[in-house]
Amino acid sequence: MDGSNLAWNGRPPRAASGRPSFAALEAAVRSLQFKHLGRDIHVVADATLRHDVSAEERPRVEAAIADGKVVQPPAGTEGRGDALVISIAEEVGGVIISNDNFAPFQKANPWLRDAGRVLGATYSQGVWVFNRRVPNPAMPTRPRTTRSL
């Protein structure tokens, strides 16, 4: 589970002084556990999550990390949390829960676009809903062109 992505779900962006909600992430985990009894759920969060949440939620984030309920990628990990989410899913043959397209990773991990490998998450009127989705295809990068004046 892309914990950082779900914690930001439905929240105002950082540029508008928004903050992720750890309570929302915890609710998503509980909902997923209820809907998929007996399944292992790996929650991955970027290192910035503990700093971005409100001061009131910060101790809960730190406790979840200390208890191993939430994992963070090691410092300096290329691709940060997204890379760890993908690596865990690949290692265990799991399904990724995220609304991210993982565009920078699609070429090296074509299975990301296979049906059933990614579920999107939506919070609506107190209910978390998880639907199959196929990430948008990564756009090929174009070489930059320069114009002379």
PLM regions and their residue ranges:
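…and closely analogous acidic/polar surface helices at protein-protein or active-site interfaces
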Residues: P12-V29
